[in-house]
């Protein structure tokens, strides 16, 4: 039996998740040489995506949401890239690299029903596989589908993106530049400002920890903004509402500033009346909605793959290595301590 390092969910956090209290790495025995379920596979998990939505799954089973809660005592789950090492499936063969939602652990034994949720990675441009967890994965599809479906960009407009250096924000900004928009990004430190402007081509960026957000928007967009792509919620959303032009669009992708707060601490946006006076469209979404990810998936994969290959779109992935770093990597992602898409490398791509 192999001692399989796994990221275990222990308790619904109060505030920020606490390593070894709310979640932690434990070894669980697994027989990777034993019988395989009919139609199933055994996977070696190579990479896992660390995303804000996982914080929302760290909750009690009595709390409803769009995604199911993690089960206390079981491994947490995420989008993984894995290599098939043994197979009893007609769909997947040993050596195939696949992606899907699976447990965060070194090896996984999947039943036939779970295998149906995994897809073989097609990689004609031979891109680094971790990119399939970023711009070519769920965050990329989130950015692409919502930018076009809800944002409805028009050349010459102004877009403001919060959490602009993150997995979703960095792609939205680059898509907006391709469409001829004036692109503004807010981030949490000066290094990230330099990254989005000099590295990604944003027209301007600002550090929200150094400037009052509303004053910064007045400075960089004195005539207002047409699209706000919201990744943080709270006071930033309130400030963006003041800056919106008539008939502007607000794409609500996430509210990471609110995820670790108690109900009494949540920020109450005070100027929602401006949605009426300025005829603003404000819309949230889930990437699996039929008019979002499924509608755009083929187009997204085709276009973004090509743009990464030809160098016109620049992905930024931050990779931490080793299951022992899983808890800290997750906290770093939630607190925005690193630049780019957060990925944990669980194992080497080769070998058993």
UniProtKB/Swiss-Prot annotation:
EC number: 1.-.-.-
Pfam families per record: ADH_N_2, ADH_zinc_N
PANTHER family cross-referenced by the UniProt entry: PROSTAGLANDIN REDUCTASE, PROSTAGLANDIN REDUCTASE 1
Function: NADP-dependent oxidoreductase; part of the Tox1B locus, one of the 2 loci that mediate the biosynthesis of T-toxin, a family of linear polyketides 37 to 45 carbons in length, of which the major component is 41 carbons, and which leads to high virulence to maize. One of the PKSs (PKS1 or PKS2) could synthesize a precursor, used subsequently by the other PKS as starter unit, to add additional carbons.
Keywords of this entry: NADP, Oxidoreductase
Binding positions for NADP(+) per the UniProt entry: 166-169, 192, 208, 231, 285-287
Protein name from the UniProt record: NADP-dependent oxidoreductase RED1
Pathway, per record: Mycotoxin biosynthesis
One function term, GO molecular function aspect: oxidoreductase activity, acting on the CH-CH group of donors, NAD or NADP as acceptor
Enzyme class label: oxidoreductase
Top-level taxon: Eukaryota
Disruption phenotype: Significantly reduces the production of T-toxin and decreases the virulence to maize.
Family designation: Belongs to the NADP-dependent oxidoreductase L4BD family.
